[in-house]
């Protein structure tokens, strides 16, 4: 064998080795997950209605597991589902519903597995008024008439948007029974904080927010906000004596408060990654205690707090 031929064989062998090394390296990068139950970085989208309580959940989880990083984007429920569908980096959404049959089929076709989803807590859509208002007793019939523009047209109703939000969808489904509200009596703002700010500045206004924005007496910022707004009582239409009920854990868990909705996770993960670890945390005692402290109804059975209400009607 001459030197020229030997050199050609060596070059060919080196080239083959480099190609094999490159292919093997690429395959390992594609196949190997970069996160575990308690480490790594994932991106999630959260319904803005639950921002206060989910910020606390993430803070405590990351403090407990310093190698875990959950990057949350807070947006409308519709935009959360857009992320779930279209953003390959999105691992999970926190919203007010699970997947329907058509969505299950879609994700099975695209992901080749079903996403996991389940209820993790229950929320109350809370009606608030200005602190100077004496109008603190509402029936569902009255809310329906006002949203339809049939009564009290001078009282402005404010939402965190006119469409695409879970609160608007809930009100249309549960109070208006699928009908649309009268947009001339409804004011739209960008988010739940702006709903609270609007009601705090407008004496003749009614707002709708999730209970985690105003229900936590251990949150100094929320206690301060409640100097400017009041949580109203809504009649329990299914109760025999038709009492007016304030949203709190007991009335949420028993459904005596009529405006209760679920809080769900939907997870795109088919291995024991960080999304699964965070869901486990939300479902277990520490996560459920955080929901409880925010005055959501929990899945885990805790003793219900007895609360003395001193606020005048």
Labelled PLM ranges:
Residues 6, 107-109, 187:
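Short, solvent-exposed secondary-structure boundary motifs
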Residues 113-115:
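Periplasmic N-terminal soluble interaction domains immediately after the signal peptide in Gram-negative
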């Amino acid at each position: 064998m001459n030197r020229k031929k030997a050199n050609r064989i060596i070059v060919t062998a080196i080239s083959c080795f480099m190609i094999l090394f490159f292919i093997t390296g690429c395959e390992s990068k594609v196949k190997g997950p970069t996160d575990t139950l308690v480490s790594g970085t994932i991106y999630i989208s959260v319904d803005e209605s639950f921002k206060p309580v989910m910020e606390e959940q993430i803070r405590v989880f990351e403090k407990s597991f310093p190698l875990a990083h959950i990057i949350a984007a807070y947006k409308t429920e519709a935009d959360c589902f857009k992320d779930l569908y279209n953003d390959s980096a999105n691992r999970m959404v926190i919203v007010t519903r699970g997947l329907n049959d058509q969505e299950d089929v879609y994700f099975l076709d695209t992901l080749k597995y079903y996403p996991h989803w389940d209820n993790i807590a229950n929320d109350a859509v809370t009606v608030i008024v200005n602190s100077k208002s004496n109008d603190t007793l509402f029936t569902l019939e009255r809310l329906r008439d006002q949203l339809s523009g049939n009564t009290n047209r001078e009282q402005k109703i404010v939402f965190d948007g006119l469409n695409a939000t879970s609160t608007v969808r809930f009100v249309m489904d549960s109070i208006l029974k699928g009908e649309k509200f009268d947009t001339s009596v409804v004011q739209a703002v960008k988010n739940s904080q702006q709903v609270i700010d609007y009601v705090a500045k407008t004496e003749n206004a009614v707002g709708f927010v999730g209970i985690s924005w105003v229900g936590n007496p251990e949150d100094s910022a929320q206690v301060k906000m409640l100097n400017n707004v009041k949580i109203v009582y809504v009649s329990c239409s299914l109760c025999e004596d038709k009492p007016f009920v304030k949203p709190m854990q007991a009335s949420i868990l028993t459904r005596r408060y009529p405006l209760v909705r679920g809080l769900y996770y939907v997870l795109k993960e088919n291995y024991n990654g960080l999304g699964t670890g965070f869901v486990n945390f939300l479902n277990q005692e520490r996560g459920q205690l955080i929901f409880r402290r925010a005055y959501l109804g929990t899945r885990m059975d805790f003793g219900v707090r007895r609360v003395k209400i001193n606020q005048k009607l």
